[in-house]
Amino acid sequence: MAEAIFKALLLVIATTAFATTEAALGQRVPCYFVFGDSVFDNGNNNVLNTSAKVNYSPYGIDFARGPTGRFSNGRNIPDIIAELMRFSDYIPPFTGASPEQAHIGINYASGGGGIREETSQHLGEIISFKKQIKNHRSMIMTAKVPEEKLNKCLYTINIGSNDYLNNYFMPAPYMTNKKFSFDEYADSLIRSYRSYLKSLYVLGARKVAVFGVSKLGCTPRMIASHGGGNGCAAEVNKAVEPFNKNLKALVYEFNRDFADAKFTFVDIFSGQSPFAFFMLGFRVTDKSCCTVKPGEELCATNEPVCPVQRRYVYWDNVHSTEAANMVVAKAAYAGLITSPYSLSWLARL
């Protein structure tokens, strides 16, 4: 715990150095591809028949382009990573991108997306991890992106949260919590993850950052439904731990088996501490900044929001504020929460 807090404080000290150093280097990687769920989605769900879309106010209240489908008040983690990699613009969503954009980068992430195909099906149309990879294959082949270029691109993946939030801990219409123990479910997810990660490798991915699942039991949603009035829902966090442990092991397995590639694990879970958040300027860690109606997860349309967004960790009942996204993105870039490589080191390869 002390180490995590110390690393978080180091992040604050290091932040101002990044902008100056990176400005002189120019774009760090030739292209950047994003896969995942609502934490990374920047508009793909806008055109889908789904309740998992946020192209309305107050989402985007602190984003220059307003509501775009990002599940936050401002920039999400891939946006900030794109800035740190010195891209001239944010990586566009797949649903609005031409094949030619595959030469620069595409965001395939979809709110509600999961490792399991049935995850989040009660929300409507969702682009699963498997389908995101299929879309990526189609785009890079249509655009005829050279393999040597794909080998130099950055790939970030954030997937798995919905397999717990909108599957395992939501019994109806799902039955996974009846079929699997915590360890068995994690093993099942990792088996699929291994296959999908191998597919990305075959498609040219050689610089890959795999984000673990955060402390879902500390989200306002799970505190309300599983917390029992005593803070974070310990059972939910306990369920996630074997997944993160196995995912980190998978990263090391791939580094061992594929010597021409570098994979790194981004450990969000271990770095989440109320005290560390407090030391970074956050004052509210268990409530949403925006107005969320009882039993709901997303912000209510055009309802009041908290006066100082940067003091809140959570924007709605699940998703982080831009300020919290900034902490995660810069910590991953600097290597404060990654193993074995920082994102900045991956970019230099």
From Swiss-Prot:
A GO BP entry: lipid catabolic process
Top enzyme class: hydrolase
GO molecular function: hydrolase activity, acting on ester bonds
Keyword vocabulary terms for this entry: Glycoprotein, Hydrolase, Lipid degradation, Lipid metabolism, Secreted, Signal
Record Pfam families: Lipase_GDSL (PF00657)
Main location: secreted
Cysteines engaged in disulfide bonds, as pairs: none
Catalytic residues, chain numbering: 38 (nucleophile), 316, 319
Domain of life of the organism encoding this protein: Eukaryota
Glycosylation (residues): 49
EC number(s) on file: 3.1.1.-
InterPro entries: GDSL (IPR001087), GDSL_esterase/lipase (IPR051238), SGNH_hydro_sf (IPR036514), SGNH_plant_lipase-like (IPR035669)
Subcellular location(s) of the protein: Secreted
GO cellular component: extracellular region
Database matches in Gene3D superfamilies: SGNH hydrolase
Signal peptide: 1-23
Family per similarity comment: Belongs to the 'GDSL' lipolytic enzyme family.
This protein's name: GDSL esterase/lipase At2g19050
